[in-house]
């Protein structure tokens, strides 16, 4: 047994080692900002509810019209994970479920079922380098 066995989170000088992560803004259904983790190299995206997207106070910047979108209609694995996690959290906090449950009790499984049927009422906001953004509904993404 060593003297430092229980001090696994400390560096050589005894200081606490902290992990650095990039922050990504997430807006919940009340329009309040939440913090999340983004992955290096991933374009900046935000998951928001449809009613927040229609309000002018949600974010500054200019929206791109649907017919002028430049990003692909494919959902990235990071967007998928973010959408499923957000929706599972909503379901666990007693949000209405939009699919037949058929005995399902796990919020993540219910969220996956909603995603498969394209019934998740969320938008993906993709920010572009010029400061504008594109809103994609989950039903539009492949």
Curated annotation (Swiss-Prot):
A Pfam family this chain is assigned to: RNA_pol_Rpb6
Protein origin, superkingdom: Eukaryota
Biased composition annotated in UniProt, kind: Polar residues: 30-45, 50-60
Alphabetical GO biological process terms: DNA-templated transcription elongation; transcription by RNA polymerase I; transcription by RNA polymerase II; transcription elongation by RNA polymerase I; tRNA transcription by RNA polymerase III
Homology family: Belongs to the archaeal Rpo6/eukaryotic RPB6 RNA polymerase subunit family.
Positions of the UniProt region annotated as Disordered: 1-21, 26-45, 50-71
Molecular function terms, GO-annotated: DNA binding; DNA-directed RNA polymerase activity
Location relative to the cell: Nucleus
Described function: DNA-dependent RNA polymerases catalyze the transcription of DNA into RNA using the four ribonucleoside triphosphates as substrates. Common component of RNA polymerases I, II and III which synthesize ribosomal RNA precursors, mRNA precursors and many functional non-coding RNAs, and small RNAs, such as 5S rRNA and tRNAs, respectively. Pol II is the central component of the basal RNA polymerase II transcription machinery. Pols are composed of mobile elements that move relative to each other.
PTM annotation: Phosphorylated.
PANTHER family linked: DNA-DIRECTED RNA POLYMERASE SUBUNIT K, DNA-DIRECTED RNA POLYMERASES I, II, AND III SUBUNIT RPABC2
SMART domains on file: RNA_pol_Rpb6
GO cellular component, one term: RNA polymerase II, core complex
Assembly information from the UniProt record: Component of the RNA polymerase I (Pol I), RNA polymerase II (Pol II) and RNA polymerase III (Pol III) complexes consisting of at least 14, 12 and 17 subunits, respectively.
Keywords assigned: DNA-directed RNA polymerase, Nucleus, Phosphoprotein, Transcription
Name this protein carries in UniProt: DNA-directed RNA polymerases I, II, and III subunit RPABC2
């Amino acid at each position: 047994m060593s003297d430092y066995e229980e001090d696994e989170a400390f560096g050589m000088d005894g200081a606490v080692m902290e992990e650095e992560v990039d922050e990504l803004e997430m807006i919940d259904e009340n329009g309040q900002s939440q913090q999340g983790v983004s992955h290096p190299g991933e374009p900046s995206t935000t998951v928001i509810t449809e009613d927040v997207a229609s309000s002018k106070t949600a974010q500054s910047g200019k929206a791109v019209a649907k017919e002028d979108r430049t990003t692909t209609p494919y959902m990235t694995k990071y967007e998928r994970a973010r959408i499923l996690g957000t929706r599972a959290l909503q379901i666990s906090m007693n949000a209405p479920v939009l699919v037949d449950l058929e005995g399902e009790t796990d919020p993540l499984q219910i969220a996956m079922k909603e995603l498969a049927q394209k019934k998740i009422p969320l938008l993906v906001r993709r920010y572009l380098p010029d400061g504008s953004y594109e809103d994609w509904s989950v039903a539009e993404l492949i």
